[in-house]
Amino acid sequence: MAQQYQPGQRWISDSEAELGLGTILAQDGRLLTVLYPATGDTRQYSLRNAPLTRVRFSPGDQITHFEGWKLTVREVEDVDGLLVYHGIDGQNQPHTLPETQLSNFIQFRLASDRLFAGQIDPLSWFSLRYNTLQHNSKQMLSSLWGLGGVRAQPIAHQLHIAREVADRIAPRVLLADEVGLGKTIEAGLVIHRQLLSGRASRVLILVPENLQHQWLVEMRRRFNLQVALFDAERFIESDASNPFEDAQLALVALEWLVDDEKAQDALFAAGWDLMVVDEAHHLVWHEEQASPEYALVEQLAQVIPGVLLLTATPEQLGQDSHFARLRLLDPNRFHDLAAFRAESENYRPVAEAVQELLDEGRLSAKAHATIQGFLGAEGEALLAAVSDGDSQASARLIRELLDRHGTGRVLFRNTRAAIQGFPERQLHPYPLANPEQYAELPSGERAELYPEVAFQAQGETSDEERWWRFDPRVDWLIDTLKMLKRTKVLVICAHAETAMDLEDALRVRSGIPATVFHEGMSILERDRAAAYFADEEFGAQVLICSEIGSEGRNFQFAHHLVMFDLPAHPDLLEQRIGRLDRIGQKHTIQLHIPYLQNSPQERLFQWYHEGLNAFLNTCPTGNALQHQFGPRLLPLLAEGDEKAWGKLVAEARTERENLEAELHSGRDRLLELNSGGAGEGQALVEAILEQDDQFALPIYMETLFDAFGIDSEDHSENALVLKPSEKMLDASFPLGDDEGVTITYDRGQALSREDMQFLTWEHPMVQGGMDLVLSGSMGNTAVALIKNKALKPGTVLLELLYVSEVVAPRSLQLGRYLPPAALRCLLDANGNDLAARVAFETLNDQLESVPRASSNKFVQAQRDVLAKRIAAGEAKVLPTHEERVAQAQQRLAAEADEELARLTALKAVNPTVRDSEIDALRKQREDGMAALEKAALRLEAIRVLVAG
């Protein structure tokens, strides 16, 4: 029989019990709208299969009015589909309480209802529920939550930035690390941690069009974040009134958005908590005028609370451009360019003084006077202690200066010079004779730098005339691969056509196992190619990538890189090397560069090596030099004027050396210390590695897979294949693929095998599986036989699991203070609680299953006795619950008060602390304390134990 819904009726969500009591708002056609006042959430359900249970109390139940007074139900009346409860209050006065006035925070005794209804579950499910509660609680308390589950090597500076930024309310910061230090990973960590904590629920990512795929791959592969990529086609074809409203994470190309006013209107209307803008240094701003892209981002930044800008370093940008990024974050603070220049100049001597302290371990008289003038009287004691050689005082002094840094809270910028762990590079150039077949090709960059593409484009050729039959680079590549034997080699070329042709050449001419990787392949096809390359035993020796196809991928398990050709821009060159040159690379990078002599390829090699020094070192000046010398460079690549060419390379080398000297002298070591975390990040690294070594997750997941009917088989070392079995319990289990998936718990394995799912406590499969356990009712009842000689046969013990539950928005993060750990009670016949003396695991080892029919018969026979004991159980754990709530309130208040005091004091000396940030923190404290005050005990599960 179909459910009858009426506005005002109270229902509870079967899948989201934490939302509290729901109120039916409307029934519109096939949709049902329910409001959950406790959290402010609204849900829409299909009328046919809404996951809702009607809230209907019975005589004898005690219920609560929204004003807080309680009523013991004597009679229930149905008035036009709405329930009216009649009973007496705490003073034995008669009262009437319509269901519309019920407290939104009322908890339900669903476990006892199921027990007495004969819905008794297997013992294994009761244990699974208990263990799920304990693991879930532990993760909520962990400082690593949102940081440790990423498919990446834990790196100190990235973790420090992620925690520092993600733990703020509506962070507004500039991430300006040097190339290769992982700004995208830092941004992904911030997004991931903010989503998991509830600080953000909707995220907008704006990127240049050519980086959309790279971001899509990074977010999906590293963070398991399902990002919706929007372009003109998807926007037009969507049936939704506002396509953006259905996306929790939207990835949008800025070029398209600027040209589409309708899409802009929809984007503004959708509402976002956090905006991330990549390549923000390309947003053009001058005091007189801003570009359309800058103006659009500025408008979005005015209405979106959190903003992350990913950009080049301030030294690369120049002061004016750097100021333009800062004013996007806080236009009130950064409103005057001239004032900003003056402030920056005033601060430079302080940074130089700190550099002296870091380098020499002491301060000269000049540096001492500079810092004293900056800190005032309050810094005199610290300076005196520093002068006496107190290292702790030096650390405190640096912290004081950091807090006063003009942009220290909004700007994070790490440099390779300050970060350890990068590999060295070795260059191996191979000049080769230019074949005569290329001599007659038409002029143009494509023909001159990539002659094989131009040759093939001339028309159909026989197999014997294909370019890879005569191009000496192919002969060289085959010989090199044979010399390196089974060593993994990554080959990158500019075009997909070249990559595919090279695979043909290796197959036909050498039989060397190779695979290809280009933008014409689907993500799944690329994953398979990458996995084939990564396989040490049976995999390909060589992976041949096109320029675009390799974006966002990590192949650092290899250390030989062949550049079959060279890209036309130094940024692309750095991207190529960056596929292998990453923190954590254990070997020296071997760069193999074959090029055709007396050709533009040779000159481009000379430009990068002799002019830009871009092979052996990163080239932070490459973009500026390309912009400055580009107009002269391109014509000279093809011309034979040796004198003009030599002059250009020499000029570029001199300019590069000058720019690098400026960059080095402009380094702000104080800012680097703040960005690197000064040791805090390393503690996070060690904690994550320690967590990786534990076996709790694999053990737990094996029981979860067994419970849900997921078959688990060995795949290879440190890897398992999961497949749904015929007895799969719930089709909604988040396996990820109906055909099955390959998983690993090993971080190293996951980094080299991107086709495998990397399971951590944060993975959607783990979180989704735990949610299915806790949101469902399975496992909240059980009956068992206990084999213990100390107990008389027939003795009945009652095990009750309670949870301290807070109904509140996720953004308050109250699970950090009052996690839903099980409060356990084990009652004997005399009402004594034995839980402290008998551990859960110890008890479990003594239990045997009882057939369901026998269990039900026993429960029905003992119903009254069991009901009385269940009613008495809450009093046993109530003191523990109240103590936990009080401790949670104390921790929340202490943390919030400490942070409020720090920010308030900081604001007095550093204007980048926003009033809105302090106000939001104060409100969060108030709301959190109020919600904890209403924390209630909920009976989670019941297990009846009969001695036999």
Swiss-Prot record:
ATP binds at residues 177-184. Pfam families: Helicase_C (PF00271), RapA_C (PF12137), SNF2-rel_dom (PF00176), Tudor_1_RapA (PF18339), Tudor_RapA (PF18337). Residues 473-627 form the Helicase C-terminal domain. InterPro entries: Helicase_ATP-bd (IPR014001), Helicase_C-like (IPR001650), Helicase_RapA (IPR023949), P-loop_NTPase (IPR027417), RapA_C (IPR022737), SNF2-like_sf (IPR038718), SNF2/RAD54-like_C (IPR049730), SNF2_N (IPR000330). The keyword Membrane does not apply. The keyword Transcription applies. Residues 164-332 form the Helicase ATP-binding domain. PANTHER family: DNA ANNEALING HELICASE AND ENDONUCLEASE ZRANB3 FAMILY MEMBER, SWI_SNF-RELATED MATRIX-ASSOCIATED ACTIN-DEPENDENT REGULATOR OF CHROMATIN SUBFAMILY A-LIKE PROTEIN 1. HAMAP family: Helicase_RapA. This is RNA polymerase-associated protein RapA. It comes from Pseudomonas entomophila (strain L48).
